[in-house]
Amino acid sequence: MEKSLLIYSTVDGQTEAICRRMASCAKNTSVDVMSISNVRNLDDYKTIIIGASIRYGKYRNELYNFINENLLVLESRKNAFFSVNVVARKPEKNSPNNNPYVIKFLDKINWKPKNIEVFAGKIDYPKYKFIDKYAIKFIMWVTKGPTDTSQSYEFTDWNKVEAFAENLNL
C-alpha cells in the first residue's frame, strides 16, 4: 500500500486536527501524520501534504525552511498544501484564489503545490494567554468577527476537509 505523509505546522492545534481528520478518511493509502518539526525523512512517501496555520498574518518560519530544504523531494511527489486561517470564515476569502494568505504564500515560495486548499480555523479564546486573547479579540473586532473571550469559535468546515482528502485519493 502506498504511503502518504500529512505534515502540519500549527500554533494551537487546529491544523493538526484537520490533518488527523484527513487521515481518518484514507481508503487507498497508509497515512502518517507528523509535526513539521519532527519530519526527518520523506523517502518512504509517495504523497506529501503540508498544512499550515496563520497567526498574526504570518505562517511560521519552520514552514518556509522546510519547503526550501525539501523542495526537490516535494516537486518529485504527489503533493498538496492547505492553509488554515480565520479569514477563510468569510465566503469571499475561503478559496485558494481569493484567500490573501494563500496568494501571498504562493508568491513568496518556489514550490508550486499540485493541489491547494484553504480551511477556516478556530478561535479558542479561553485557551489563549492574556496578550494573545486581547490581540486576537481586537483583530476580530476590526474584521467583524466574534469577540466574546469566554467562548471558542470553530469555523472549520469538516465536510470540506473530508472532500479535500477524497480529492487527493488518500
Predicted regions and their residues:
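FMN-binding flavodoxin-like domain, especially the glycine-rich phosphate-binding loop
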Residues: 25-32, 47-48, 55-170
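Structural motif
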Residues: 7, 49-51
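Structured loop/turn residues at secondary-structure junctions
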Residues: 10, 54-55
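N-terminal beta1-alpha1 ligand-phosphate binding loop
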Residues: 2-27
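Short acidic low-complexity segments
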Residues: 33-43
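Structured loop/turn residues at beta-strand edges in well-structured enzyme cores
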Residues: 2, 43, 111
